[in-house]
Amino acid sequence: MTAVFDASAFLATCSNRPGVYRMFDADAKLLYVGKAKSLKKRLASYFRKSGLAPKTAALVVRIAQVETTITANETEALLLEQTLIKEWRPPYNILLRDDKSYPFVFLSSEDEYPRLSLHRGAKKRKGRYFGPYPSAGAIRESLNLLQKAFLVRQCEDSYFRNRTRPCLQYQIKRCKGPCVGLVGPEEYAEDVRHSVMFLEGRSNALADELNTGMEQAAMRLDFEKAAELRDQVAILRRVQDQQSMEGGNGDVDIVAAIVTPGGACVHLISVRGGRVLGSKNFFPQVAIEEEVGEVLLAFLGQYYLSHQERDLPAELIVNVMHEDFPVLVAAIAEARGRQLEISYRVRGTRARWQQLAVTNAEQALGARLANRQHVAARFEALAEALDLAEPPQRLECFDISHSSGEATVASCVVFGPEGPLKSDYRRYNIEGVTAGDDYAAMHQALTRRFSRLKEGEGKMPDILLVDGGKGQLAMAQEVLQELAVAGLILLGVAKGVTRKPGLETLYLNDAAHEFTLPADSPALHLIQQIRDEAHRFAITGHRARRGKARRTSTLEDVPGVGPKRRRDLLKHFGGLQELSRASIDELAKAPGISKKLAEQIYAVLHSE
C-alpha cells in the first residue's frame, strides 16, 4: 500500500451497499475494477494484514486511491463493472480476448418485415436496441421464447431475400413465412408491436391486451385463436424482465444535484421501461455560493435543450425543486414537441431511485474533490520545479502516432488543476508530409492549433508539452516564432537512454536548458501522466484511421465500386478478409454485383 493511501480512513466512510470500485496508482492510472455486494466488506478484504494471494498483494502495494459507485443491486454492478473494464482494460483485471460488450436485442427498422436479432458492438444500424442483457445465453432464451410467441423472423437478411419457399422455421411454427408472402405486412406489424411492448418492459399491458383478445376469440368460438393467445400469455409470464427495478415502469430520468464549497456534482440515472440503462456524473463549474436549485435548473436546460438528439423521458425525478421548472418544461415542450413532467415528492421505488442518485452524487463529488487536491498538488510541484510564480492553469501536450508513416495522427490533450479537460482534446489527421517525418507532422499540427488561437479560437495554454525531445522542441519553437505566439512556456520531454519511466530528460524553452527530476517527483508524475494520455489519444486515433483506410483502400481501385457499394460488400461478407476469400460466383451473389463486376473485384483483390 502506498504511503498516501489511508485504508482505515477510507473504509470508515465506505458504504455497505452494492456497487463498483476502481483502484488507481500514484500516477492516477486505473489498476483494477471490481464489483461487490457490500463495497465496505469487499474492499476491507484487500487490506488484511495476511492471507492475500500474490497477485492481490502486488495490486494492494500500488493502490493510491479508490473510487466507488453505488448501484441498486448486484446485477447493475456487474453491468457497470463490465463497461468500465471494456473501456479502460485495467492491468489487474482478467481481460477476455474477444472483449465483447453485453448483448442487445436489435429490431431492424428499414425492412417491410423487420428482424429481431442479437447485437453486440457499436449501434450503427438503423433500428431499435433493447438491453443490455447480462449474457448471450439470456438473450438467446428470450429471443427463442419471443419467436415462439410472436413468430417474428430472426433470419439473416441475405437468407430472407433469397428464399423461394418457406424454411424449417415455418414448418415448426416459429415463423409466418414473410419471405414468401405467407403473412401480410399489417398482421406482421402487429406481431412486431407485441414484441416491442415486451422488450420495452410493458409485459403487464401486453398480457392484458392478449387476455382481452383471448376472451373475445372465445366469445366468437374461435378456440384455436384463443388457445394461441393463451400460449402467448403463458410465455410472457416465463420471461418477465429480471432486470426491472421492482415495482418500476415507464421512461424516467432521475437527476440529483449536490453543491459543496469545493464544487458541484449532478448524477443522472436513465430508466427505460423500468430498467436502469446507465448513469453518469457531471461536474459543472459553479460559484461557491451557488444554490442547488440553480445548478440543477442550469444543468437540465443545457442537457435537454442543447442536445436535441438526446432521448427525452416522460418524467424527471429531481432531488430539489426550483420555481422556474414550469418555464423549463414549457421550453422543452416547445423545442422537443413532447411534454415532460418533473417530480420531486415521490414514494416507493421512485423514492429509492431518487435517494440512489443523491448518494452517488455525494460519493462522486467527494472522490473528485480528493482527486482534485491530488492533481492540484502535482501542479504546485510542477510550478516549483520550473520556478514559476504560481501554478499553471492549462497544460497542452502534443504527440504523433503512425505505422511506418501510414495514417499519421497528431493528438493534443489538455490538463488543468482539476485533471484532464477531455472536451478540449483534439486530433489532427496529418496530410501532405513525407511518410514517417514526425517533425513535419508536429509542425503541421502545431501550426493548425496555434493559427486558430491567433484567430481567436480556443484558450492559450500556460505550458506547451512536446513529447520527442530536442528535435520536436525545436519544431515547436519554430512554429511559435512563425505565428508570433508569445507568453507560454515550452517543455520538451525525452525518454532516457534506457527508455524507462522515471529517467526522462526535460528541456525548458530550449535544448540548452536540460534537466531531470527525481523519479518520485510529483511534478514528473504529472508530466508522465499527460504524456502517456497524449500517446494513448494519438494511437487510438491512428488505429481508427488506419483501420478505416485498410478496409476500403483496396476496393477503391475497382471501377464501378463506389462508397455505398464498398460498404454493402464489406457488410455482406463481414469484412475485407472474408471478402478476399470469396470466389467469383460468391461475389456475384452479393446484392448489386454482376458477374462481370465480380470478376473485376476478384482480379483486384488477387492482383498481388
Curated annotation (Swiss-Prot):
Residues 204-239 form the UVR domain. It is found in: Cytoplasm. Gene3D superfamilies: 5' to 3' exonuclease, C-terminal subdomain, GIY-YIG endonuclease, UVR domain, UvrC, RNAse H endonuclease domain. Keywords: Cytoplasm, DNA damage, DNA excision, DNA repair, Excision nuclease, SOS response. GO terms for molecular function: DNA binding; excinuclease ABC activity. Residues 16-94 form the GIY-YIG domain. It holds the Pfam family UVR. GO terms for biological process: nucleotide-excision repair; SOS response. GO terms for cellular component: cytoplasm; excinuclease repair complex. Interacts with UvrB in an incision complex. Belongs to the UvrC family. NCBIfam families: PRK00558.1-5 (NF001824), uvrC (TIGR00194). The UvrABC repair system catalyzes the recognition and processing of DNA lesions. UvrC both incises the 5' and 3' sides of the lesion. The N-terminal half is responsible for the 3' incision and the C-terminal half is responsible for the 5' incision. This is UvrABC system protein C. It comes from Pseudomonas paraeruginosa (strain DSM 24068 / PA7) (Pseudomonas aeruginosa (strain PA7)). The gene is uvrC.
